[in-house]
Amino acid sequence: VERPPVWLMRQAGRYMKSYQNLCEKYPLFRERSENVDLVVEISLQPWKVFKPDGVILFSDILTPLPGMNIPFDIVKGKGPVIYDPLRTAAAVNEVREFVPEEWVPYVGQALNLLRGEVKNEAAVLGFVGAPFTLASYCVEGGSSKNFSKIKRMAFAEPAILHNLLQKFTTSMANYIKYQADNGAQAVQIFDSWATELSPVDFEEFSLPYLKQIVDSVKETHPDLPLILYASGSGGLLERLPLTGVDVVSLDWTVDMAEGRKRLGSNIAVQGNVDPGVLFGSKEFITKRIYDTVQKAGSQGHVLNLGHGIKVGTPEENVAHFFEVAKGIRY
């Protein structure tokens, strides 16, 4: 390749005026993320303006939960709320395996439509939540500051947590395959909360399940690139390639050159510009892009942020980011 491909996490979303306008018309997040036409329209908003190399499905990692018998909602200003947190063996036994065709047909339809829209000008990306992160939401009842409930389960009743993690593992492997069968050309796995675990606990409660997902997907879809993103993963970096994923997405708290060294040469990287950089001057943004690309080298790098675009980011700065990125030549 002559330059690194580029897309941005949360490239569709609240920093865009076109998205804000849509939110006024459709105030409920679940409606915006579960209606085919809206999902396609929102996913394409950044594509129409910036022409990124990757167009990621507009969705949420919790979208499969109702299909697993776990009701949830996303409440404005509060984030995700799981109404009946899973805290007992009996509650976990009620969790069903996820059948995407039955519960989220709009995801498959949206991916197919996105492929038709972007043709071969960009890759269509799908995504799923990782088992430990999904379990964290479901046990905590939503987002958490200290993760004491999931850790109580992990350390006092590990068998219950392993049962839940296994259900999410089987379900997410199926969900990735479903997305690939409907047009996703790469899938990113978000394990946002795995970095709350110590390395030894990551090796028990996250790593084996991620590896199982990757192994299962590679059996049926050997050529589907899988990306793993876990924010704050500096303490776990060397362990991430053991999952078998093709790409590790680094957050900005790890220096790109050091991250590459620590990951080894057999794995591609994605990232890792600090999203806050997009509040800087255009010169500053340019400098940071070049810095990141130089440190990543010319092999196996997807340019991205180290986390999602922040609300309030000036759209013109995002436009500048893409312009500079697409002008790079190795």
Swiss-Prot record:
InterPro entries on file: UROD/MetE-like_sf, Uroporphyrinogen_deCO2ase_HemE, Uroporphyrinogen_deCOase
EC number, UniProt record: 4.1.1.37
Main location: plastid
Organism superkingdom: Eukaryota
The keyword Cell division appears for this protein: no
GO cellular component, one term: chloroplast
Subcellular location: Plastid, Chloroplast
Gene3D superfamilies assigned to the protein according to its UniProt record, in alphabetical order: 3.20.20.210
PROSITE patterns: UROD_1 (PS00906), UROD_2 (PS00907)
Keyword list, A-Z: Chlorophyll biosynthesis, Chloroplast, Decarboxylase, Lyase, Plastid, Porphyrin biosynthesis
Site (Transition state stabilizer): D60
Pathway entry: Porphyrin-containing compound metabolism; protoporphyrin-IX biosynthesis; coproporphyrinogen-III from 5-aminolevulinate: step 4/4
UniProt-listed Pfam families: URO-D (PF01208)
GO molecular-function terms, A-Z: uroporphyrinogen decarboxylase activity
GO biological process, alphabetically ordered: chlorophyll biosynthetic process; protoporphyrinogen IX biosynthetic process
Binding-site list for substrate: R10, Q11, A12, G13, R14, F29, S59, D60, Y137, S192, H307
SUPFAM superfamilies: UROD/MetE-like
Keyword Lyase: yes
Catalytic activity annotation: uroporphyrinogen III + 4 H(+) = coproporphyrinogen III + 4 CO2
Subunit structure, as described in the record: Homodimer.
Similarity section: Belongs to the uroporphyrinogen decarboxylase family.
PANTHER family per UniProt: METHYLTETRAHYDROFOLATE:HOMOCYSTEINE METHYLTRANSFERASE RELATED (PTHR21091), UROPORPHYRINOGEN DECARBOXYLASE (PTHR21091:SF169)
HAMAP family in the cross-refs: URO_D
Protein role: Catalyzes the decarboxylation of four acetate groups of uroporphyrinogen-III to yield coproporphyrinogen-III.
Protein name: Uroporphyrinogen decarboxylase
Organism whose genome encodes this protein: Hordeum vulgare (Barley)
Primary gene name: DCUP
